[in-house]
Regions:
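AMP-binding/adenylate-forming catalytic core of the ANL superfamily
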Residues: 162-188, 202, 350, 357, ...
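N-lobe entry segment of adenylate-forming
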Residues: 1-108, 112-119, 125, 206, ...
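Conserved AMP-binding/adenylation subdomain of ANL enzymes
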Residues: 283-303, 313-356, 369-370
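Conserved pre-ATP/AMP-binding loop-to-beta segment of ANL
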Residues: 91-93, 215-223, 231-266, 273, ...
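Conserved AMP-binding/adenylate-forming core of the ANL superfamily
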Residues: 77-78, 91, 95-149, 167-172, ...
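Structural core segment of the AMP-binding/adenylate-forming
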Residues: 150, 154-241, 353, 360-361
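Gly/Ser/Thr-rich phosphate-binding loop
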Residues: 237, 321, 328, 355-359, ...
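Conserved ATP/PPi-binding loop(s) of AMP-dependent carboxylate-activating enzymes
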Residues: 444-448, 460-497, 536, 632-633
Length: 658
């Protein structure tokens, strides 16, 4: 890259001028001394993160992999629990666990949680678990599941949490690829009042493992009502028998070198097999703590409500670990926002005096389908801020939550990250001092994340208004340092994903930067449409559709067209006050052209009741495109409702296949 281009790229990456001066100065510290910035970040967290031994070296790069805080000794469980108890926080509530389906509420304090985790740790040792062993956890949200994660971390075992409800095939893939020899599961779960036979799904999964896998034990969390659970002698054990194994064992923590693994978390890939991202004790701990402080303003006085599940990275980072590192109270909610009532989340917020909320655009749009009336029945005045991630928070959903539900009294802040990044990489720093919110934009790279928007063909740093792809140019402490068991895929999928992005972490998102430095996402890079030579993001068209009062949710994908190369096809979920009709379809098409101009060409719009989404709430546009173009659907193990696929099929029959 020529010098003037490098200078321009640095200038474009500078933090937005709309940030307060002290925040801009903080951002620039990372630009000027990257390693020094992250060393100071770790040192500044000394009252919440404990080091048994300070690191010898801040950063070590062995492309494409890397290490942080080399030679340091820590343990995230010790920092989260033992250290907090030593600081006098033992009597404070650590977790409040609630089930929407059963109505059960349980609270555990820091000292109670520490004692519970010690017992789990001793029992794990009692069944033969050693440092470095992988433990699959297949349990619904709750204190037992979070406690098992912490117990694994405590003894140096590596937890592999699998979303409770994943299919046997998906479980088997994750157990096999991680090399887990143990599964901890619950006998049964429930969702919207329907029972889920979790243990039976685990049994099916274990039958699919290849010969020689060496699986050892399944531990089953059961209740007195679970009388008919199939158990395999010598392999399976009930919860009481598991806890009895703690006898004669100790629940002491292990001092972990900074770069020893903490957990593995599978993430979706373009192939049938998931990618197994990994995180280590030190870098992950520092990163999720700092982003919690800088972006969310997490602090010890918070009652924090993340609506995610521990099966996802948000659940790991901001249901379990970061809230405990900050010494606050975290609510673990098992269930949906609208079952058995449409005000379940609002009820949780009011009863617990929630101060901070982390949710997803899908969650907000789901609440919007019931209107603002359920919110009006509750006192939400304790809430100080809402942060949102998972997909782009479209302006209509932001406006509804910001203005209708919270009446402009608090900020609703969008931000962006991935499983592989463990925490925010793009976001408005609420904790440090915000710039104005621009609805539809996630704002700018977070402190200590050196990001750019480049042309994926030649790596050229792009200017204001030029569409390209988001890349990270330097590894940061929360970035996955490798893929478990597949370093070659790590190199090719992330650091050499495109001809122009070699040596850059390829996030896979299409984006552009505006004159104030705000980043606007257009969708996944492979979902950007090219209509008559115009590059148009699917998110842009979805935002236009959702800005119409009739539309609650929309999914858009490009489909082949002989004349224009591609045109847009859309499926929408309507507001309860509107009915499908040809007149409404035409009105929506006209509305999109009015919002976006004549360059956008819509082939058709299908009306459906639900979009195909992953269990973490992301719209599965690839499934829609595959259905439209008669392609293979691929891996559907993460889909929330299989019936949504049938809805798309029926809608396609009505509008005609492409």
């Amino acid at each position: 890259m020529a010098n003037h281009e490098a200078d321009k790229a640095l200038e474009d990456r500078k933090p937005a001028g709309l940030l307060p001066p002290h925040v801009r100065a903080f951002y620039m510290r990372a630009q000027e001394d990257y390693e020094g910035f992250w060393e100071e970040a770790a040192l500044s967290a000394k009252h919440d993160i404990h080091w048994f031994r300070k690191w010898d070296k801040v950063f070590e790069h062995n492309y494409p992999t890397f290490k942080w805080y080399v030679g340091g000794k820590t343990n995230i469980c010790y920092s989260a629990l033992d250290y907090k108890v030593k600081m006098g926080k033992g009597a404070k509530a650590a977790f409040i666990s609630e089930s929407g389906d059963t109505g059960e509420v349980k609270t555990v304090t820091y000292i109670q949680l520490l004692n519970l985790v010690k017992k789990y740790a001793a029992a794990l040792r009692g069944i033969g678990v050693n440092k470095g062993d992988r433990i699959a956890v297949y349990m619904p949200m709750g204190i037992e599941a979070a406690g098992m994660m912490l117990a694994c971390a405590r003894i140096g075992a590596v937890h592999v949490v699998i979303f409770a409800g994943f299919s046997p095939r998906a479980i088997a893939d994750r157990v096999e690829l991680s090399g887990a020899k143990y599964v901890v599961c619950k006998a049964r779960g429930s969702r919207r009042g329907k029972p889920i036979q979790l243990k039976e799904m685990v049994d099916d999964a274990l039958d699919r493992l290849p010969a020689g896998h060496g699986f050892k034990h399944t531990v089953v969390l059961n209740t007195p009502e679970d009388k008919d659970i199939p158990m395999k002698a010598g392999r399976d054990m009930y919860w009481a028998d598991f806890l009895a194994k703690a006898e004669g064992q100790n629940g002491d923590y292990v001092e972990m070198e900074s770069n020893e693994p903490l957990f593995l978390l599978p993430t979706s890939g373009t192939t049938a097999k998931p990618k197994i991202s990994m995180q280590c004790h030190a870098g992950y701990q520092v990163y999720v703590y700092c982003m919690g402080k800088w972006i969310y303003n997490l602090n010890a006085s918070d009652i924090w409500f993340s609506t995610s599940d521990i099966g996802w990275i948000v659940g790991h980072s901001y249901n379990v670990y970061a809230p405990l590192l900050h010494g606050c109270t975290s609510i673990l909610y098992e269930g949906t926002p609208d079952y058995p009532k449409n005000d379940m989340w609002y009820d949780v917020i009011e009863r617990n005096h929630v101060t901070g909320i982390f949710t997803s655009p899908t969650g907000i749009r789901g609440l919007a389908r019931s209107g603002v009336e359920p919110a009006r029945k509750h006192d939400l005045s304790s809430v100080q801020r809402v942060v949102c991630a998972g997909e782009v928070l479209n302006p209509a959903a932001w406006k509804w939550f910001q203005e209708e539900v919270f009446e402009n009294k608090i900020p609703v802040v969008d931000h962006m990250w991935q499983t592989e990044t463990s925490g925010a990489i793009i976001g408005n720093p609420y904790g440090l001092g915000m710039a104005p919110i621009k609805p539809g934009s996630a704002a700018f790279p977070t402190p200590g994340v050196i990001a750019d928007i480049v042309d994926e063909k030649d790596g050229r740093s792009l200017g204001v208004g030029e569409k390209g792809v988001l890349v990270i140019t330097k590894p940061f402490p929360g970035l996955t340092p490798n893929l478990w068991g597949d370093p070659e895929r790590y190199r090719t999928d992330y650091w050499e994903a495109r001809p122009g992005t070699k040596g850059m972490y390829y996030a896979g998102d299409a984006a552009e930067r505006d004159a104030d430095g705000y980043i606007w996402f257009a969708g996944r890079a492979d979902e950007v449409m090219k209509i008559a030579a115009h590059r148009i993001g699917t998110i842009e068209v979805e935002n236009a559709l959702v800005s119409h009062p009739a539309v609650v949710e929309a999914a858009v994908t490009g489909v082949p067209d002989e004349l224009r190369g591609e045109v847009a096809s859309a499926f929408v979920v309507l507001n309860k006050n509107f009915e499908p009709s040809d007149a409404l379809k035409k009105e929506l098409m006209d509305h999109v052209r009015k919002e976006m101009g004549a360059i956008i060409v819509m082939k058709d719009i299908g009306f459906i009741h639900m979009l195909p989404k992953t269990r973490s709430g992301k719209i599965m546009r690839r499934v829609i495109k595959a259905l439209l173009t008669n392609k293979e659907l691929g891996d559907l193990s993460t889909i929330e409702e299989e019936a949504s696929v049938d809805e798309i099929k029926e809608a396609i029959q009505k509008i005609g296949k492409i």
